[in-house]
């Protein structure tokens, strides 16, 4: 877990606890190519070291494939999906509009796409304000399933509904995904939670901290200082007496400010 991940975790934890809610932990481990052995155990250890104790059992998406398949089948029965082998390279960044390209890689695993419309999806983000997107024109028919794996968009929509998520707090890099998720929620007759997208932590090169950019993982040796920096980034600078306090004390102070 890098510093940007910690900021997102702290932001969502404080928001949930300020409202007297539960903070649920979901491990998004369905992308087998990107899953690193031992990473989940390390994340759980880091969260506990920083006083970020979750409520209930940890949810592993890799154990919920049947729930995602059922949602996909429901959309298929409504005639809202189609099979496609177009690659990202073939699309060259253009929205997919049910017109597959001629340069199809027939060796690639088939993807299932959702048919989109020209409907504009609008919502009010607690931090970013009003957001509107025409999914059909700006994104196109997006992937729900590829090969043996569900897409991120489908999985999180199913999980948010299944576990009664009332508020989603996450990084602003996922703001653009939210209209797609609301679109799926409406097609599946699922409730739409409230959303709050946090500012991103950027590296010295101006890029978002991420595993792909080789962001350094946080340690637990200087966790009091690291927690203070995370809270400061979120606008909750602890007072001087708490500057070197244990993370759980700093979190309790931040929660009480609400």
Positions of PLM-derived features:
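Low-complexity, flexible helical/coil segments
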Residues: 58-65, 190-193, 204-207, 229-237
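Hydrophobic alpha-helical context, especially transmembrane and signal-peptide helices
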Residues: 3, 70, 150-151, 197, ...
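N-terminal Rossmann-like or analogous alpha/beta NTP/dinucleotide-binding catalytic cores
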Residues: 1-95, 172-190, 242-243
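Short secondary-structure transition/capping segments
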Residues: 62-78, 99-110, 237-255
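Non-catalytic terminal extensions that flank enzyme cores
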Residues: 18-21, 119, 207-258
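Active-site cores that bind ATP or allylic diphosphates and position pyrophosphate for catalysis
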Residues: 83, 88-220, 238
């Amino acid at each position: 877990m890098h510093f940007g991940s910690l900021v997102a975790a702290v932001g969502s934890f404080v928001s949930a606890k300020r409202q007297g809610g539960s903070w649920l932990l979901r491990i998004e481990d369905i992308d087998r190519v990107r899953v690193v052995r031992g990473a989940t155990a390390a994340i759980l250890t880091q969260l506990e070291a920083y006083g970020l104790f979750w409520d209930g059992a940890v949810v592993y998406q890799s154990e919920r494939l049947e729930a995602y398949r059922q949602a996909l089948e429901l959309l298929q029965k409504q005639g809202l999906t189609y099979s496609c082998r177009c690659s990202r390279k073939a699309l060259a960044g253009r929205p997919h509009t049910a017109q597959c390209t001629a340069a199809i890689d027939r060796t690639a695993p088939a993807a299932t796409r959702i048919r989109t419309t020209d409907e504009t999806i609008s919502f009010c983000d607690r931090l970013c304000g009003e957001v509107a997107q025409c999914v059909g024109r700006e994104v196109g028919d997006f992937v729900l399933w590829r090969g043996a794996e569900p897409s991120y968009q489908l999985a999180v929509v199913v999980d948010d509904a299944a576990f009664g998520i009332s508020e989603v707090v996450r990084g602003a890099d996922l703001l653009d995904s939210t209209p797609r998720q609301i679109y799926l929620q409406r097609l599946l007759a699922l409730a739409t939670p409230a959303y709050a997208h946090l500012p991103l932590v950027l590296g010295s090169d101006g890029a978002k901290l991420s595993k792909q950019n080789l962001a350094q993982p946080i340690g637990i040796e200087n966790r009091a200082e690291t927690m203070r920096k995370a809270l400061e980034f979120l606008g909750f600078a602890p007072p001087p007496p708490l500057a070197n306090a244990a993370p759980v004390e700093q979190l309790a102070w931040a929660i009480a400010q609400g």
